[in-house]
Amino acid sequence: EIGSGLVGSEMCIRDRDPAMQKFRDNRLGAFIHWGLYAIPGGEWNGKMYGGAAEWLKSWAKVPADEWLKLMDQWNPTKFDAKKWARMAKEMGAKYVKITTKHHEGFCLWPSKYTQYTVANTPYKKDLLGEMVKAYNDEGIDIHFYFSVMDWSHPDYRYSIKSEEDSIAFSRFLEFTDNQLKELATRYPTVKDFWFDGTWDASIKKNGWWTAHVEQMLKEMLPGVTINSRLRADDKGKRHFDSNGRLMGDYESGYERRLPDPVKDLKVTQWDWEACMTVPENQWGYHKDWSLSYVKTPIEVLDRIVHAVSMGGNMVVNFGPQADGDFRPEEKALATAIGKWMNRYGKAVYACDYAGFDKQDWGYYTRGKNGEVYMVVFNQPYSERLIVKTPKGISVEKASLLDTNEDIKVVETARNEYNVSVPKKNPGEPYVIQLKVRAAKGTKGIYRDALT
């Protein structure tokens, strides 16, 4: 191992404390990307940019002072925190991640450390505070997204090339500490800090600071969780330290992608969370979703279950409009997800990797009491769902999760079964619950081929 003095991971396996157990049980979250970028919605000076709307300042090369003049237009008159919270509740989200401050530097709370806040807009009120209360009132956990990279701050540096840069960046880190302390103090019910904008050389060169921030927040808010994206070790390694150990409480590198369900089973050894957009790459509000592929509700559900089947969480993103409302497509998506979760959520919440070999029909998940769920997305023409159990495990019974209708199970070979599809096609992805137990001896029934 690399020297014991290295600032890196404090653990290398799944944490079993109550906060991480709750994080794990939640499984489904919603992401809210909301900032000044919602006003232009991907368009600047008559030109529409197809890239991520929250990066428009960068795409269009807009000077910081000009960009921040958008604050004069920030007045989301249709914003209703209670409606937002009800939408998340109906979707089945157990937690919501909110962009307190994205790369542009605009703060949704009245920070006393910068002028670029909601307090200095026509709206004036503490948007973040309204959201925290509304979501908490619905029993939904609050997570704070926070961008360390800040395009509005004169002391931010992408890299440290001189003593002057070092001094300026030290001031910037102190500013960031103060904002984080402010958030932790103002909103003590926050359960998680999800850091972003931490990939620059300046931050990787200051790995000690990332460890300091994690410790500071955990001391201020016992039980708060921190994502791996914050951390860098003394060698500049991110997410995982130079010894290969996870930094932070859970891995957060799966953005708009997922681990392969056959090749990447190593992720089942630690906690992780993926996040996804609905268009291909739009986090903030963009006027024109026709510029890229837009996922259907079934495709979103597939990604949610995919994550859970490998022991991970999934966060589905929403980019509210500048007026504070959601586009109709996002409302419809939340409704569709919620309808399915109401029926089949038992196969998602508090579920984990089942240890069964992946099959083409969909995914397995495992409940806390050992029950195994088959979440079927692809109905086979054979009308038989192949199940291959781990060695020493047999399938005793199968039934539909939502109706308890018994499903026929036929043992076809050692540790292999055919599970029939339902007599009536559910017309949507459905769930079969398997009752499994330790297998009785079958040595005399099956023999391996001699080749």
Question: Where are each of the predicted segments found?
Answer:
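Mature catalytic domains of secreted/periplasmic carbohydrate-active enzymes
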Residues: 9-10, 14-451
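Positively charged, low-complexity/disordered segments
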Residues: 1-8
